From Swiss-Prot:
Any matching Pfam family: GTP1_OBG
Any one GO BP annotation for this protein: ribosome biogenesis
Subunit structure: Monomer.
The protein's name in its UniProt record: GTPase Obg
């Protein structure tokens, strides 16, 4: 299936149902009281994270999701049916952004996590709600409010423990093939990898970690050159970055300059990403003898000002790969994910209908004070309609 990590969708919540104006009519009861029911609330739109999905390709074709409208109230104090909710399933790791405000509404990082993205409209009130000691036959009702409407930008960010960095043809895909069951395409030309891929590295029956391979970076990637800039976001959730350096590039380029380009592109893209733990890994040491490889790696590290440990491996022959993987596993165990305590935001804001509609009446009263000719009555024959507003 084609990998798609960005999509734009429109979500529209259902409108609230209108209240009903009705009066009780039964035999021998010629003047029954009001019995108009309230409308139903509009349906909400939810996003739900699903670990069985790994792409947003479905939302390249289906772009609009609308919840059901609440039904109108009916006579005999019958409340309208609430509109049905709509649930949109997205892959785990999806970030949700409101295009209108640029606000990040949430990150879907756990299977089954739900996020409300459009709130349904509030129900309107039937005339029963307006009955009082001074207005026995109210003919007022309120209309349901419109539901939320939003354009959402969905961005899929892979959830991996380890991210692979490097120039094209540095051996990233060969490495992930060597340590996991993932089989990304490997060839002797640049940009063989066109989309990110994940591999699970199993050290034993109980220990494992996930590694992400993204297309190689080139100079100017932060400004849009090459393919890597589109996929750098997939490294934002990694705990450690493995910077693979081709110790003896076949094109004759300088490994030191190649490494500096990668570091520079990281810093241009995001300070947060550039500050992540990064390990230096020299690949393709099978192309020379051990002493020469060690001397060359040491010289490159010194030129980069690298004072920490570095690794010498050959992904093709798997020299040094096992040691590197165990060190990564140890680092992951010793540095568990620290989840920042997010502000406790209620998934659903609760409003009492009387608070909401009381505000409407207060606004109506304020307008009436400014305009003597203003009349809030929906029925011109109801002379007591306005009296309710002033004597509620």
């Amino acid at each position: 299936m084609k990998f798609v990590d960005e999509a734009t969708i429109l979500v529209v919540a259902g409108d609230g149902g209108n209240g009903c104006v009705s009066f009780r009519r039964e035999k021998y009861i010629p003047k029954g009281g009001p019995d108009g029911g309230d409308g139903g609330d509009g349906g909400d739109v939810w996003l739900e994270a699903d670990e069985n999905l790994n792409t947003l390709i479905d939302y390249r074709f289906e772009k609009s999701f609308r919840a059901e409208r609440g039904q109108n109230g009916q006579s005999r104090d019958c409340t309208g049916k609430r509109g049905k909710d709509v649930t949109v399933k997205v892959p785990v790791g999806t970030r949700v952004i409101d295009q209108g405000t640029g606000e990040t509404m949430g990150d879907m990082t756990k299977h089954g996590q739900r996020l409300m993205v459009a709130k349904g409209g509030w129900h309107g009130l039937g005339n029963t709600r307006f009955k009082s000691s001074v207005n026995r036959t109210p003919r007022q009702k309120t209309m349901g409010t419109p539901g939320d409407k939003r354009d959402l930008q969905l961005e899929l960010m892979l959830l991996a423990d380890v991210g692979m960095l490097g120039m094209p043809n540095a051996g990233k895909s060969t490495f992930i093939r060597a340590v996991s069951a993932a089989k990304p395409k490997v060839a002797d030309y640049p940009f063989t990898t066109l989309v990110p891929s994940l591999g699970v590295v199993r050290m034993d029956n109980e220990k494992s970690f996930v590694v992400a391979d993204i297309p190689g970076l080139i100079e100017g990637a932060a400004e849009g050159a090459g393919l890597g800039i589109r996929f750098l976001k997939h490294l934002e959730r990694c705990r450690v970055l493995l910077h693979l350096i081709d110790i003896d590039p076949i094109d004759g380029s300088d490994p030191v300059e190649n490494a500096r380009i990668i570091i520079g592109e990281l810093e241009k893209y995001s300070e947060k990403l550039a500050s992540k733990p990064r390990w230096l890994v020299f690949n393709k040491i099978d192309l020379m003898d051990k002493a020469e490889a060690e001397a060359k790696a040491k010289a490159i590290a010194e030129a980069l000002g690298w004072e920490e440990k570095f690794y010498l491996i050959s992904a093709a022959s798997q020299q040094g790969v096992k040691e590197l993987c165990w060190d990564v596993m140890t680092f992951i165990i010793e540095n568990p994910i620290v989840q920042a305590e997010e502000e406790q935001k209620p998934e659903k804001v609760e409003f009492m209908w009387d608070d909401y509609h009381r505000q409407q009446l207060e606004e109506a009263e304020a307008e009436a004070e400014d305009d003597e000719d203003w009349d809030d009555d929906w029925d011109e024959d109801d002379e007591e309609g306005v009296e309710f507003i002033y004597k509620r």
